[in-house]
Structure formats: C-alpha cells, structure tokens
C-alpha cells in the first residue's frame, strides 16, 4: 500500500526537490542581467547586498540574486557554471539541512553558494573538511571566487601559531578541519584573556562529508590531556602474565566487544600474580587492596584478544597508532583512554607512555550543536537520516544527479571460504587488467589490503596500495586510480573527497612538473595523454569497483560504490563475500549457512540469491541500530558533562571580561567566614562548646588571619559579631596587600588566581567524572538506572567542585605574596605581567597543538592534587587518598572529619 502511495504522490524527498526546482527558475531568470555586468559591477554586488542587510533585509530576501552572482563569478574566475541541481544543493545548505549528492556532482562548488550568502552578515562561515589536504585545496580553489567578490578567505590546519589562526578565523569564510575547530574551541576556553582566543562566536557551519564527522566520529571525543601517574612497569608485568593465560581462562563476546575472566581464569591469574609478588599470597584479585589491578588485567585481556595489529592499530616508529575503522586512516596523536593504549604498548613491546588525565574534552556531537545554523553535504546520508534528525535536528534531502547514473551495480557473489573468494577476485582483476579497465579494490583493514597486495605481487600485477601507512600519498594515488590499466587497493574510504577521473587527473600530474624545463610542452603532452587514456578507459567499461567484504554500515558500502560512475561515466561495482568475513561470521552466519545448505554450495562455486542479500542487509541494519544506540547513549551521558562545561566556560568568559574582580572575592570571603565561624561556634550552642582553638587554626589556614582569642572573651559577644569581625580582618588583610602591591596588580592577581583555580578544580572534576563513568554501568545490577545515577552523582560532584573552588580561591588570594626585597614599588605591577606571561607560554607549549596535549599546564601556585575515587583509597596509605575535602570523613576510618584528623596540620 505504501509503495502504491509513493508512486502516486512521490516521496517526501521528491516533493521537496520538486518545490526547490520551482525556486531555481527565479535564479535562472536573473542570469541574463547578471551576465551583462562588468567585473567591477559584479564585485560591487557584495557591497550592495551588505547595505541591504544593514537596512533590514534578510538573507532570504537576497538569496536568489546572491546565488546568481556567485554562479557568474565562478564562471568568470574558474570556468565552472553551477548546474541547476547544484543550486538546489546550495538552497538546502542555506536552509540548515543536509544535501545528499553523488560523488563527482561538485559538492565543493555547491558550498560556495551558501558560504558567500551567509558571509555577507559579517559573522563568519566555517566550511569544515576531514583533513588538512582538503582544507588547503578547497580554500585555494574556491577562495578565488570569494576574493573576486570582495570577501576574505582563511584556512586552518594543524600546527599554525595563534596569530595566524586568529586572522584566518576573522576572515569572512574559513576552511578548517573538524579536529582543529574542536581543539581550538577547547584551547580558547583555557586562555587567560579574550585577546588570546582565536575563534569568533559560532554562526554557520557547512560540513563536507557530514556523515563521516557527525556519525562515524561521534563516539570519539576530542580530548586535551596530560599524564597523571607512571605505571609503565605494572603494565609490562601484567602483560607478561596475561600472555600465560589459556583460552579457557576467559570468555569474549565479539558482538558486544566484551571480555571477562572465567572462574578458572581468576584462579589461574591470581596464582600468577602471587608468584610475581604483585598480590599477597592467599588474597583474591577482587579483595579491596587489589581492586585497582582488575582494571590492568581487563585492559591487557582486551589488548591481546579484542585488538589486532594492522586492523585496529599499527606500530610505527616505536609508537602504537590508532586506525580509524571507517576510513582506514591513522588517527594522528589520538590515544585510547582508560589505560588501553598502555596495554597495547606493553603488548607490542614499545615504550609505554604515561596514562593521561583529561584537562578538557568535547564530542563532535556537542561541539557542532553550538552553531545556531548547521548544514552538511555528503554522497551518503539517507540511511542515517533518522539519527541526523534525532540528534542534530538536521533533515536530509537527496538531490538528483545532473547526468543519469549509468554505473552497473552487480549482485554480490558469496563463497564458502576466504581462499575461494580471493581466487575469484584475482580472476576478475586479471581480466580487467588485461583489457585495460581500471580497478579500485576496497578492503576493510590494512591487514586485508596488504594480504591482497601480496597475492597480486605473486601474480605480477602492478598495483598501488592506499591505506593508513601511506596517508601522505593518499590524494594523488586515488586521483590516478581511473587511469588505463590502473589497479588500486584502498582501505575503506581512504582518499574520500578526491574524485577519480577516468583517464586520470591532469591537474595533479601537472603540479608535479618542473616549471623550468619545457613546461608548456609537457602540460600539453599530459593533457593529450589523459584524453587518450580516457577514451580507452571508457571503451574498457569505466572504473570497476570491487568490494572484498561488506562493512558493518550500508553507508560505507554505498560510499565505495559511489567512487565509480561519477557525472554519468560508465562503471561497474561488485562485492565478493565469504562465510569467513567478520560480518557474516558474527552477525549473519546461522541464517546464511542454512540458506547455503539448502541451495547446496559446492567448493569454488559462488551463490547469487536475493535471500542472502536480504539477510546481509538485515545484519547490517542490526549493527547500525546497535551503533546508533551506542552513540545516542554516549550523547545522553555527555550531555550531563556538556551542561556543566557550558556553565564553567561561560563563567570563565565572564571572569575574563570582568573589570572588577572584587565582587566575587567579597561575597565569597563573607560566605566562607560565616561558614567557618558557624562550624566551630554553632548557632544556639553554649560558650563552653565553642572550639576557639580550631577556629583560629582554620581562619589562619584559609584567610591568613591571626585570630585574637580575646575577641571572644566578652560575655555578651555573639556568633554574628565574631563573623563580622573576621570579615573585617580579612578585608584589612586584602587592603594591606593593595597598599603594598598596588590596586592594579591585586585586581589582576585576583582575576588570574580565580581563573587558575577554576581550571584546577575543573580538571579535577573531569577526572572524577571519568572514574564515575567507568563504573556506573554496574548500578544496573542493583536495579538502578545508570544514567539517572550518573546525573545525580555528577551534580553532587559539581556542587562539591564549586565549594572547593571557593575555598582554594580565597586561600590563595589571602596567602598571595610577592617578595619586594629586590623589586622597586613602581615596578611591582610588572611582576603580575611576568607571572601572566609565564602562564601563557606554558599553555602555548607546542604539545598543546597535539590531540594529546602533554603536561604543559604549570603555574607558580601550589598544584591541586587530583581527587581519587573513595573506593580506590587504601586506609593505611595516605599517599593513595589524593586530595580530600576538609569536611569529608577521614579515609583512615577514624570517623573524624579530615580536617580534625590527618588533615589537621595542612
């Protein structure tokens, strides 16, 4: 019934596109008049549009004329005229939606339309790409159009100094990678003045390859971190022990990607740990004193049994480097968290780096939701449309192709074993190679690509391998994959964003030429050669794309298919599968094996059957659904931290903007003074119950006040009067500092101390949240909702953090001291500037431009010791307690508050 209705009325997508086509006529009707304009008149249109916006017009009032202007500018500057379908794509992007356009349909050119229009407001537009190469390429090629029309263009790539970045972000249109944008946002919120920040307020972003960034990378948070402790030796010891375990000692679930020790495994590993003197004899791995070891053992088990070298990671130059499962690219600078990376380093016998503590983090989900207006483009988004709508409130519209797709997608071939599958793939590659038809072979891992490469080497078939190991050559190799007799093996979607042109890409070959020797003649020769090869390739059938396995996501399979048949070119695609493939083995083996038995599969034979294709699609949908729920669950938890992050970042900005820091200082001084007095002199208590001794100690610790016991000797003195006296004494101490150091220095110092203290307690808080997240799922066993428990406890931790902030801030301000012996009074304000400069330089350490920023946060203030989860504290070992709040019960088990027990002398 539904299919009949769709045929009668069309889908919602069809109706949207039809409506957009009617709008395109308005743009086309303006073209004759725009064509008559001189270059100068065309450029002046930008000034005219800005004036209209200033006088109250909206972007929608000028959208058709602005698009017509960009189309004409592109034609004059680049020799490219936007097709009608590209104009539709531009309207979709301008309206804050995602446009799905096939490979080769010119998405890069499409982005110029909404980018130009929205940049007219002067608030900036970010065009987001997945790597530095594409950011540079697109800003250089499309920047010519923007510059012609009088707009400025910036490009952001890794490793740029702040002043260069700031200028690029202040441009009308900025091309940047998603990673750099996210990290610059985090780094900006660790800066100490607004002038040091590089980003402007969020306005409008256009994300290229939007599915890759908002879906594939959604589960990977951006983290700036620093090392916390050195347990390298312990990781090494545990690794050696885990290698001695038997297969019966643990159980693993490949679907859920979990691994656990069995009862026999626990007994076995306990004996091994005891033998190595890591645990005491006759104690259990799960005894309180040994609980921290469980984490090390679990991560070592995962490293050895759930992670494979050259599939999940590779080892390069003595470092373990993560491979992106969707693109096959190395994720430069990223490290697995929670000790997993250290476990992998121990497994591969390379230098074990310190574990890291989070200093700042954000997911792409929450970063991109900061933009008031967001849009994106990709060749494959319809399969993920529900998720994009649910999480980002982005609708997806599929735009028809300019030329009819002539590519032929052949049925899958299923074989009984991997060897039979490879034999069939080799036969097809040989046939295509002999007739000159270019072939692109897609694999799901480096290991598989190198395995296939070795087979082709034995058969003496020339080929190129494109995977994470050759990232630098990625764009060039993929661009030439359409040449006559070319055979290219690519890991997943490596080279995405670069078109495969039949016959080859002449521009990239020309870039390699030496301009000093016969340059023009060589250019002409290359163009003639490419034109000839294009004819030969078209006669041979175009690009043949071979998939060696189905991916977990249908979208990734569609991306691979989409490399062939660009702009109406001929081409073919075909997937070869076997029962040994991961997807078949883990998710669809039982169902498909039954079908194959019914059909009677023989050795070397391939099966083509719609029932198998449907079973595979169901398996993929099941995995996609599972991954979607994981991303959604991550977002639910991350939203808790995101709400807190927004509060902290907003407060930080307010502090930086503040011209008077005394307001917070005075209110906090009064609040803490009252709190301390009432702690030792409770309301309604008898005078003999007042603890004047400890009141004096506490006032000196917090305010540096030397409290005179005679103040309370009067018979009629009240708690309120003593509180007022304490507050006045604190104000007097601060006033004396102003007289000694100058009001300007103290104002700046208070602001600086407040910022550094906020950073310290926030870092500490993130560490506590990390610990909370790691164990919160276990609450489900107690019939409690982990998310509700996480929200409740995270709120409590946040309140505790704010209390710690106040106490540490006040304590530091009132103990703040500059040695004036060798400093003239008129130069004292320079001391603060020097202090501030040192802080800024430590934060701008080159390590901070890396994903894993290293320990570059240092101040002249006493560092705050990290908070430790209470269950990880050893009552007999104060060094294991971390920082303990003064009003907490002492971890030693005495039942006293910490400040009256082990913390009495602090």
Curated annotation (Swiss-Prot):
BP GO terms, sorted: intracellular protein transmembrane transport; protein import; protein targeting; protein transport by the Sec complex
Domain of life from the UniProt record: Bacteria
PROSITE patterns given in the database record: SECA, SECA_MOTOR_DEAD
Catalytic activity from the UniProt record: ATP + H2O + cellular proteinSide 1 = ADP + phosphate + cellular proteinSide 2
Record GO terms (molecular function): ATP binding; metal ion binding; protein-exporting ATPase activity
Record Pfam families: P-loop_SecA (PF21090), SEC-C (PF02810), SecA_DEAD (PF07517), SecA_PP_bind (PF01043), SecA_SW (PF07516)
Disulfide bonds: none
Residue segments, region Disordered: 862-886
Keyword Transport: yes
UniProt binding sites for ATP: 86, 104-108, 499
GO CC annotation terms, alphabetical: cell envelope Sec protein transport complex; cytosol; plasma membrane
InterPro entries registered for this protein in UniProt: Helicase_ATP-bd, P-loop_NTPase, SEC_C_motif, SecA, SecA_CS, SecA_DEAD, SecA_motor_DEAD, SecA_preprotein_X-link_dom
Compartments, record wording: Cell inner membrane; Cytoplasm
Keywords assigned: ATP-binding, Cell inner membrane, Cell membrane, Cytoplasm, Membrane, Metal-binding, Nucleotide-binding, Protein transport, Translocase, Translocation, Transport, Zinc
Enzyme class: translocase
Record family assignment: Belongs to the SecA family.
Protein purpose: Part of the Sec protein translocase complex. Interacts with the SecYEG preprotein conducting channel. Has a central role in coupling the hydrolysis of ATP to the transfer of proteins into and across the cell membrane, serving both as a receptor for the preprotein-SecB complex and as an ATP-driven molecular motor driving the stepwise translocation of polypeptide chains across the membrane.
The protein's assembly and partners: Monomer and homodimer. Part of the essential Sec protein translocation apparatus which comprises SecA, SecYEG and auxiliary proteins SecDF-YajC and YidC.
Record protein name field: Protein translocase subunit SecA
Lineage, opening ranks: Bacteria, Pseudomonadati, Pseudomonadota, Alphaproteobacteria, Rickettsiales
Gene that produces this protein: secA
